[in-house]
Amino acid sequence: MILNSSTEDSIKRIQDDCPKAGRHNYIFVMIPTLYSIIFVVGIFGNSLVVIVIYFYMKLKTVASVFLLNLALADLCFLLTLPLWAVYTAMEYRWPFGNYLCKIASASVSFNLYASVFLLTCLSIDRYLAIVHPMKSRLRRTMLVAKVTCIIIWLLAGLASLPTIIHRNVFFIENTNITVCAFHYESQNSTLPVGLGLTKNILGFLFPFLIILTSYTLIWKALKKAYEIQKNKPRNDDIFKIIMAIVLFFFFSWVPHQIFTFLDVLIQLGIIHDCKIADIVDTAMPITICLAYFNNCLNPLFYGFLGKKFKKYFLQLLKYIPPKAKSHSSLSTKMSTLSYRPSENGSSSTKKSAPCTEVE
């Protein structure tokens, strides 16, 4: 969608140079359906994650704090998803007013940054817990985890401020519809560049590099531990899990980030072809479904790596109430071996200790 401003009114009036871009009947049916599925699955799954972690597991570990906040961030986003489903089903006609336009848009942006930052911190926590279990004891505390989550929520809110400021309701004169969209004045070309690059770099590239580095180091440490303890059979599931975590994150977000970058080029007028604009506007909601559906499954995905999480989750599904006493924290297959150098410089392996527990 290429928008040009014409007149100013209570609702700003603009022109769309490519009015048919992204407007296909199958999009107006398929995307609301996918949004509805994401909403139902996401609300159900993330609500159960919150209940399991808070009431059954008693929020005892650092990783459980990150997972709880991840689920809460997803729930905040999911609550606005029906608005986007209606918006798309109405062929991109926004009936909810300017305030809800800003709030719903900011929720999408907030969830992107909060979830990515939390996953990044979770990967760092896994690295410290598995590779440096003894050294990281004093740093991996509940207080540090809670303060980190507060900082993440503040940073995600700060990163979403431009969306609150610049996302508005506009009336497109040549199509006679009201949309909730970004609109950039031609002379203010630095804004879309800044927003697009922030989303690409801060919302994907840097976090992915940190996640990739963390799990690569975990991979190497566990591999070395198995080589040292040759009499112990190698559990390849550990390495499959690590590979799945990295690939899951990468392929969930790469399509959306690519089309976000192309959309910035269109908004800047670098790309003028309406055929390309149609491809981008058609693909964008599909990539959003992919990214945010996987995003909403993350708490379940990470949680089910832990045996105790699975146990309590199944208990909850069977309506078995949590016991009054506190439960010990989650552990996963990645915590069956921890690796650390001994004091004399040689390498040693040991069975998992509480400091290596993943959730």
Swiss-Prot record:
A GO MF term: angiotensin type I receptor activity
Main location class: membrane
PTM (free text): C-terminal Ser or Thr residues may be phosphorylated.
Amino acid composition bias (Polar residues), ranges on this chain: 327-351
Region (Disordered): 326-359
Binding site for angiotensin II: 15, 17, 167, 182-184, 199
Lipidation (S-palmitoyl cysteine): 355
Membrane topology of the entry: Multi-pass membrane protein
Any one biological process term the GO annotation gives: regulation of vasoconstriction
Localization per Swiss-Prot or TrEMBL: Cell membrane
SUPFAM superfamilies referenced in this protein's UniProt entry, alphabetically: Family A G protein-coupled receptor-like (SSF81321)
Disulfide bridge map: 18-274, 101-180
Pfam families reported in the protein's UniProt record: 7tm_1
Glycosylation sites: 4, 176, 188
One annotated Gene Ontology cellular component of this protein: plasma membrane
Transmembrane annotation, as ranges: 26-55, 62-89, 99-125, 142-165, 191-216, 240-268, 279-304
Subunit (UniProt): Interacts with MAS1. Interacts with ARRB1. Interacts with FLNA (via filamin repeat 21); increases PKA-mediated phosphorylation of FLNA.
Family: Belongs to the G-protein coupled receptor 1 family.
General function of this protein: Receptor for angiotensin II, a vasoconstricting peptide, which acts as a key regulator of blood pressure and sodium retention by the kidney. The activated receptor in turn couples to G-alpha proteins G(q) (GNAQ, GNA11, GNA14 or GNA15) and thus activates phospholipase C and increases the cytosolic Ca(2+) concentrations, which in turn triggers cellular responses such as stimulation of protein kinase C.
Protein name per the record: Type-1 angiotensin II receptor
Organism of this sequence: Sus scrofa
Gene: AGTR1
